[in-house]
Amino acid sequence: MSKNNYYPYPPTLGKVFLFKRGPEIVSMESSETIQPADKLESILNSTSTITAELLFNTFDIPGISSKTDKLKLLFQKAFEQGINPNIQDSSGNTLLLYACQSSLVEVVQFLLKKGANPNISNNSDNTPLSKIISNRFIDKTEIYIAKLLLQNGALTELKDFVGFTPIQSATQYGHTEIVKSLIQNGADINVIASIETNSYYSGKSLVESVPSNKPELKALLTLTKACKDNNFSIVDNTITAKDIVEFIDWQLSITPENSRFFDKHLSELDNLKNFLETKELVSNETIQKINEHITSYSTTEISSPDVTPSFINEAEHQEYNLAGETDKSAPETA
């Protein structure tokens, strides 16, 4: 979606826009129009003060995806001049949200390193993560960006404007790879859609919200819940041996580097191993592989990836009222 869809009118000379620095709203006089791509170099070489509006306008420059190095230099220059990396436009959108929306991976990484907060919601209660998830079709780049956000402190339980958490939305859209990342980062899989959402999903669990053309996602969520609760009575004959093998492959790919709650993961994996030992669903070799995985990490000191505490603390007290695989198949309503 173009940034201009968020402004009450396109950026033109002399218009006044509201921007937000943290809790403070400041009025900024517009003096720049959208710059063509070949002017980005001249902006960098200019001695003029960089305004917040100019930064937001850069996302509309044609071919900007091929000029991310210069864009990062521009942002760096702006930050050195005192612009807050978490500045918001009149709709509450941040630079990070636009970078995510434009699939500019290097810019997303740069902004996160500069202190961009992935948990700031815009006026529609959308964060960068929820904006990505709400796309009906997502590609590998968007999946990667979602993982980056989670690795850099994006919270798993912030609700969007409808009232859904990220894992609820990802499940409803059938975004299996993002669901996996959310689970690895501690997302609540027992969440029930509130009746207040007044939607098709009202009162439904995650498993009940899975699109009918995503049986593998339904199997993944069922097996995840069985492992967490150590209750495998919910594993019925709709879950195939192939589903179980794929689930095991995913579980074995989880490490302390890509999971915030690896100690819990090992416990759940042990539950799975004990269950499989009583069934003839997989080979003894596979069970042995699970056991070796558990043993190898049980004998070493585990340190979870760092999550910036300020993001979590800020999100809990936030009052912004102005605040992988390519997944190309559209979900069907069950």
UniProtKB/Swiss-Prot annotation:
The keyword Repeat applies. SMART domains: ANK. InterPro entries: Ankyrin_rpt, Ankyrin_rpt-contain_sf. The keyword Transmembrane helix does not apply. ANK repeats lie at residues 80-90, 91-120, 124-161, 162-191. Keywords: ANK repeat, Repeat. Gene3D superfamilies: Ankyrin repeat-containing domain (1.25.40.20). GO terms for cellular component: cytoplasm. It holds the Pfam family Ank_2. This is Putative ankyrin repeat protein RBE_0347. It comes from Rickettsia bellii (strain RML369-C). The lineage of its organism: Bacteria, Pseudomonadati, Pseudomonadota, Alphaproteobacteria, Rickettsiales.
